[in-house]
Amino acid sequence: MKRSYSLAELARYLDAELKGDPDYEIRALATLQSASAHQLGFIANPVYQKYLATTQAGALLLRPDFSEYYSGHQLLVANPYQAYAHVSALFDPSVEFSPGIHPTAVIGDGCHLGHGVSIAAHVVLGANVSLGDGAALGPGTVIGDDCHIGARTRLAANVTLYQGVSLGDDCILHAGCVLGADGFGFAPSAGGWIKIHQLGSVVVGNRVEIGASTCIDRGALDDTRIEDGVIIDNLVQIAHNVRIGKNTAIAGHTAIAGSTQIGANCTIAGAVGIVGHLHITDGVHITAMTLVTHSIDKPGSYSSGTPMSQTREWRKNAARFRQLDGLANRLIKIERDQSAE
């Protein structure tokens, strides 16, 4: 991968207006506070405007209305944060994979390997696995029988796909995530729990990113489905038969119980718990550590839980909360007595 770009090249890549030397070389990205010569910074939040006078960055990504506050090389764009996201791909060494198959890899019968695939050391492919063009599998990854991995999809080290899992194009799966393990399905009986065998699979759309050590269980009968453009953080649990709509974002430590359906363009913050068999409509934002116990049919922001306070204050409030029912009954009695007078 190329490691340096002229400002002219970056301006063309970002469709940006260039102010400064078109031949000036950018070799890395950095924050306003830490940047030095030949590094590109950006400002997306006005709170950082105070650093424009002192930054040592070689050039900055700026909105046009910030241009007058900075005298150095500039790439002017409507949305600097989006531009930074796009240009970050040019300087990320982790996206480099060399085509080829490591001699320690095990390739099952009937596999179809697309053009330019990269298969690292100790990868195991079951029978009838299909890899799209440019797909890359990191060391120690295990792919079960009959899985499909789309073009340019990248799996980091020690990813596991159970039998029949399907991944779309341009996905990223980080280290240690597991897709297609059995959902938590058991029928109670007098003699103990009877396992319900999970006969569905997991189907993931295009441009999905799944964080490290996240688990997505296979469906009991229907497939668990993750639609296009979904982003999922580390350490998320998604149970069997769940459906996640397009472009929804799910932060770390969230757990979603079985058969819940979540709409498109939702944001679910960290450590949210969502019980099973619910429907959450499009455009819902759920704040951190919320417990969702019923379906949500209107877009908007939803919260639950008690925010942090000093321990002494929290203990007083907790004691009062335990007395809330009694206080409510006393208030009702007072209102009735006043009405009777």
Swiss-Prot record:
Record key words, sorted: Acyltransferase, Lipid A biosynthesis, Lipid biosynthesis, Lipid metabolism, Repeat, Transferase
Family of this protein: Belongs to the transferase hexapeptide repeat family. LpxD subfamily.
Protein's name in the database: UDP-3-O-acylglucosamine N-acyltransferase
Gene3D superfamilies found in the cross-reference section: 1.20.5.170, Hexapeptide repeat proteins, MurE/MurF, N-terminal domain
GO molecular function, one term: N-acyltransferase activity
Record's function text: Catalyzes the N-acylation of UDP-3-O-acylglucosamine using 3-hydroxyacyl-ACP as the acyl donor. Is involved in the biosynthesis of lipid A, a phosphorylated glycolipid that anchors the lipopolysaccharide to the outer membrane of the cell.
UniProt pathway: Bacterial outer membrane biogenesis; LPS lipid A biosynthesis
EC number(s) per entry: 2.3.1.191
Catalysed transformations (reactions): a UDP-3-O-[(3R)-3-hydroxyacyl]-alpha-D-glucosamine + a (3R)-hydroxyacyl-[ACP] = a UDP-2-N,3-O-bis[(3R)-3-hydroxyacyl]-alpha-D-glucosamine + holo-[ACP] + H(+)
Subunit structure: Homotrimer.
Cellular component terms per the entry's GO annotation: membrane
GO annotation terms (biological process): lipid A biosynthetic process
